[in-house]
């Protein structure tokens, strides 16, 4: 069996570095033919390119000469360098067997579309692609199994769905750790600092995703993602809090059966599945242990304390562009919180204001340019609300 060629977008981030761990642990199974990164850590990108003998690298923010110099300093030689805002999409469109999109944020949409249009299997960790551009992604998708989710929750659902026909599915159940503030009241969360929000109890992730987990906006985005990926109405998608993060999600079938996927929290497992789907990679991650007493608990989400899930449901019902507005406004609000310019509770409060003010999109707006225009409006409005200063709790 020949090695599966892989392009990895977001190689210096959390998903990217773990994906390269998976590749290194399965010699001969995968061949990395392209790496893309934002450009904040050129030394790491260069080391990755040299270690995996990668012929092409793409950098969103950086000069070709600087990237080439970093690769030479790491011991590399003939590496093609792409730079600029469109570099990742250029690389994604070159037709590798698999493109793993581990980019954070809505900038991942264009590379997602490029990979799909090129016919590559898309191992998708960039949930914003589906949140912001669901209709565009569906239009670009060439076959039913072309998108393989890398989020642990959606990977779990994809695995559980193997147990029955789609017509037999009654409900999807997404699990949430509850984040660092599970059980807290809104009053208790009023003074939360970025340091507190970034102290996730079970997962090691980047600052934006970790903050989204603290507000539960991450779960709201995942709810939209599940709705798009599996074509299940949002009314039939339930979110439950599972603090142990061992059961990653479940599928309830019409006969009353519930099929769950369980494993210790380790992103290497869904990453390996994304790269090898529909096959499994032996030893990708450690299994559950059954030689010691343990317990798994589940509890409902406190929607009053964490309104992000309701916002996500409202966005889906409002229009195809409202989810893009939700996501863009949230990215701006999270950045302001991490910079110390916005209180924790006002992150979701700001998103609620922006979402409520967004007008009905004009006819014909459902294009990449239309999505980008909606995002630009949402970012500008979110920044303006942050600059205003007073509390915007919902």
Curated annotation (Swiss-Prot):
Q: Which gene encodes it?
A: dxr
Query: Which keywords describe this protein according to UniProt?
Result: Isoprene biosynthesis, Manganese, Metal-binding, NADP, Oxidoreductase
HAMAP family, per database record: DXP_reductoisom
Q: Where does 1-deoxy-D-xylulose 5-phosphate bind?
A: 127, 152-153, 177, 200, 213, 218-219, 222
What Pfam families does this protein's entry cite? DXP_redisom_C, DXP_reductoisom, DXPR_C
Taxonomic classification: Bacteria, Bacillati, Actinomycetota, Actinomycetes, Micrococcales
Annotated pathway: Isoprenoid biosynthesis; isopentenyl diphosphate biosynthesis via DXP pathway; isopentenyl diphosphate from 1-deoxy-D-xylulose 5-phosphate: step 1/6
Q: What is its EC number?
A: 1.1.1.267
Catalytic activities: 2-C-methyl-D-erythritol 4-phosphate + NADP(+) = 1-deoxy-D-xylulose 5-phosphate + NADPH + H(+)
| Positions of Mn(2+) binding | 151, 153, 222
Cofactor list: Mg(2+); Mn(2+)
Under the heading InterPro entries, the entry gives: DXP_reductoisomerase (IPR003821), DXP_reductoisomerase_C (IPR013644), DXP_reductoisomerase_N (IPR013512), DXPR_C (IPR026877), DXPR_C_sf (IPR036169), NAD(P)-bd_dom_sf (IPR036291)
Function text: Catalyzes the NADPH-dependent rearrangement and reduction of 1-deoxy-D-xylulose-5-phosphate (DXP) to 2-C-methyl-D-erythritol 4-phosphate (MEP).
Q: Which residues bind NADPH?
A: 12-15, 38, 126, 128, 206
Report what the protein is called: 1-deoxy-D-xylulose 5-phosphate reductoisomerase
Q: Which GO terms describe its molecular function?
A: 1-deoxy-D-xylulose-5-phosphate reductoisomerase activity; manganese ion binding; NADPH binding
GO terms, biological process? isopentenyl diphosphate biosynthetic process, methylerythritol 4-phosphate pathway involved in terpenoid biosynthetic process
Q: Which family does it belong to?
A: Belongs to the DXR family.
